Amino acid sequence: PLGKWTTQRYDFMQLKKILSHWQTGLDGKAWNSLFWGNHDQPRAASRWGDDSPLSAKMLAICLLSLQGTPYIYEGDELGMTNAYFKDLSQYRDIESLNAFKELTGAGLISADEMMECLALRSRDNARTPVQWDDSPNAGFTTGTPWMPLNPNYHEINAEQALADPDSV
């Protein structure tokens, strides 16, 4: 009844079976497009891992080890994570806002539980400005960004990554 709006983690054995199915099924017959995320998915490190640089690196190694053309969504090369917004007013995604209204209004889930779901599953997690540096607005703009910044832009950004030989 809640669809994607759950805090349940993904089944990695099922993911392994799916990846194996596509790799063996297309081998020698076709070429796959490979990606973990896009503007309609939560951040890859948060969705599939635990927000750590190690998880982001594991995802990159897995993606780049598969047969096909890898696509890396903006910020994933830095290990950008979900924003974990604390207030509904920080979200812009109509799907997220409608789901909050409908599911809490129907009494299927509490407002606090739905905020947890949004923090994990909302598309807005991948729509925050790219974190170029730790300056105001993460170096993304001198104007006012449409989406709030991910609060971790001081720690996760392109400038930091370039200076760290062990970065994602």
Functional labels for PLM-detected ranges:
Residues P1-V168:
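Active-site and adjacent substrate-binding regions of carbohydrate-active enzymes
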